[in-house]
Amino acid sequence: MAQKLTLEEKQGIQRMLLDYAARYASQAKAANSLHGVTSPGTFNAVVNGKFERISDEMFLRIKAAVGSGKSEGWQICQTSAFKDVETLLADAQQYQNVSWIVAPAGIGKTTAAFQYSKTHKNVFVLGCSEDMHKADFVEELAKKIGIRNEGLTVRATLTRIVDELVKMNRPLLVFDEGDKLTDSVMYYFISLYNALEDKCGIVFLSTPFIQKRITKGLKLDKKGYEELYSRIGRKFVPLSGVTEYEVNAICRNNGLSDDKAIASVIRESVELRNSQMEFDLRRVKKSIHKQLRIAAAPRL
């Protein structure tokens, strides 16, 4: 049987929810963005400290939806790539421009985007997937922004999204793993851009695969590709890779100080590609966890 949450743990989740709500124009919009996770009534009860009728399961669902997204106790290290993503997001939000950031998987793009959204208002990060249809894309975007779209058509929902965004102070849309979107969904970006030009920043994050896809689409004169390429400024913004020095810093920030253990993490996490050392931060994290467990094991 699972252990019951303490009052202190519930208050911690309440603080997470309050921090989450502070990123929206109103608590009502924050509650709408959690549609499917919790009801407005439950949202208000937790915010106001009325915990009596809220189940532990609901508290944990709220925590999963609004929490930091990082493992308990894991310290994020601001690598060069992390800082570059934050700088590009800040520029897009400040000047309402559009860019497409590309870097290999596991470099920390998503983490940087979510960390930025936690400390800046009107920033909405939408995770993209290959099975997203137009209706899914628009519905998820509406939910992120805090719009209830029951009874609305896809086109009407898109209009509501645009109307809501243009009323905000420097809104920013971040489409994570944008290369996974199908062509039909990408066409919606063109419609969004046309309606939001100079009114909303837009940033895509993806692997470099998108460059090949766009180049091929341009050669084949595929519908929408020329307009899409034009709207991202006809270029992709690459990020620098994670260095051995940064992996060392991540190890030390997360409690691993033994030089031999750190060397093991580096060996297990490195991959040679085009004669260059590349590190996947997911592998780094897994290897650090392994070394910490080895260090904590009782010695016979």
What are these regions (language model features)?
Residues S71-I76, G146:
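Glycine-rich phosphate-binding "P-loop"
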Residues Q94-Q115, S129-E130:
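Walker A/P-loop nucleotide-binding motif
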Residues H120-E130:
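Conserved catalytic segments around the Walker B and adjacent sensor/switch elements
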Residues I76-Q93:
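Pre-Walker A adenine-sensing motif
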Residues H133-K134, E139, R148-Y188, A195-G201, ...:
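Mid-core helix/loop region of P-loop NTP-binding domains shared across ATPases and GTPases
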Residues M1-A64, S68, E72, K235-L300:
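C-terminal alpha-helical "lid" subdomain
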Residues K121-V123, G217-S240:
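A short helix-turn-beta junction within AAA+ P-loop NTPase domains corresponding to the substrate/partner-engaging
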